[in-house]
């Protein structure tokens, strides 16, 4: 049986973004829904991991292309948070780093204001589903940091039930491609990493 996921209504999310425009809640929600970050990744995100020139988030285990609206939001937030040049998730009031519980509470309040009974995890799952539907299993594995096999186990029944399966999953190829990508990410510019790139 397919596990049911709570998926946000896009129009409702746009209303939430408009209501929270320019604040910490908008940043948190965009990082979860448009970039697929976990709560722990949101609270740990530093400005040196936000590559505006390369339009990407550079996390320790993966690189995530920046959604244009998330990029615009982060650029405005960067200017506003000049008082805290390190941490991205800071409070509106005093620009101090937010605790994980505060991030969840802020997101829940913003989502509830539009009648959306969702969590940050629901937003991340929706991000992953959208990546699978739009780009396939391998790409979704790369940007989510979840192995393709684990993605298939969790999301394949849901996609089949919704009749939105993008392609038949290629178990061997996708998994090998993802594992090679992870090794290259971990090795970086080491001799082994450079050899793999060649």
Predicted regions located by residue number:
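Alpha-helix N-cap/helix-start motif at helix boundaries, enriched for small hydrophobics
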Residues: 28-29, 40-45, 140
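Short, basic (Lys/Arg/His-rich) helix/loop patches that form interaction surfaces
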Residues: 104-142, 161, 168-169
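Intrinsically disordered, low-complexity regulatory regions
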Residues: 183-198
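DNA breakage-rejoining catalytic core of tyrosine-based enzymes
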Residues: 1-14, 60-69, 82-86
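Active-site/catalytic core of tyrosine-dependent DNA strand-transfer enzymes
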Residues: 67-116
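Catalytic-site neighborhood detector that most strongly recognizes the C-terminal catalytic loop/helix
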Residues: 137, 144-177, 181-185
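Basic, Lys/Arg- and aromatic-enriched nucleic-acid-binding interface segment
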Residues: 5-39, 124
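Conserved tyrosine-mediated DNA breakage-rejoining catalytic core shared by Y-recombinases
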Residues: 35, 44-74
